[in-house]
Design a protein with these regions (language model features):
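Carbohydrate transferase catalytic cores enriched for Leloir-type hexosyltransferases
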Residues: 1-203
Length: 203
């Protein structure tokens, strides 16, 4: 179950040790497809020189077809992270570890160019993790007033937003509290209904 855990709890400390995570880091959770905007997120992170932890099965896929246009973002990500020891790729992780990860992350960064729903935002908010995202697709509606919004098409805007939240403890607490409230609006039943409503709107 996604929830906020006390930072002293074993689960939280254990996930840090298990994956050798830094004390503070930005977190990305998800796939590597055109709409996720991951190459631009990495460029933004490299501008401000802070650690980025990325969780998602596709991130560790070494056997993808590099000539397939759908995989171009994976090709770009491979090149961008090659010599960057501040970027940690975890690949697929269990739900238990993911919950602990949201709890220890300083900020979730999800600068998508489009989302049908944006589940990681709600998962992060439920765990009290501050969120930086965009107003693209359904994200503005899902995030409400509980996120720091950036421009999906501008790496400088993404960098500034992440840095602002990353370095501002007061803002982190404010976004965390607002996020916990916002997430309560989306019980799983509501989430399914809302997802269906949003999908019907785009069909």
């Amino acid at each position: 179950e996604f929830k906020k855990i006390q930072s002293s709890e074993f689960k939280v400390q254990n996930v840090k040790r298990k994956y050798k995570l830094p004390e503070k880091f930005a977190l990305y959770v998800g796939d590597v497809t055109w709409n996720k905007n991951l190459p631009r997120l990495i460029e933004a992170i490299q501008k401000i020189n802070i650690p980025l932890v990325m969780a998602g099965k596709a991130l560790m896929d070494k056997n993808f077809d590099k000539s397939n246009p759908w995989n171009q973002d994976l090709v770009k990500v491979e090149k961008l992270v090659e010599d960057d020891n501040k970027i940690i790729r975890l690949g697929f992780i269990s739900q238990g570890d993911l919950i602990a990860l949201y709890n220890v992350a300083t900020v979730l960064a999800m600068p998508s160019r489009y989302e049908g729903f944006g589940l990681p935002i709600l998962e992060a908010m439920t765990c009290g993790c501050p969120v930086v995202t965009t107003k693209e697709g359904s994200l503005k509606e899902v995030a409400g007033d509980a996120s720091y919004f950036v421009d999906a098409h501008n790496a400088d805007s993404i960098a500034e937003g992440i840095e602002e939240v990353y370095s501002n403890l007061k803002l982190q607490k404010e976004l965390s509290q607002k996020g916990l409230k916002q997430a309560k609006k989306f019980t799983w039943k509501k989430t399914v209904q809302e997802t269906m409503r949003i999908y019907r709107g785009v069909l």
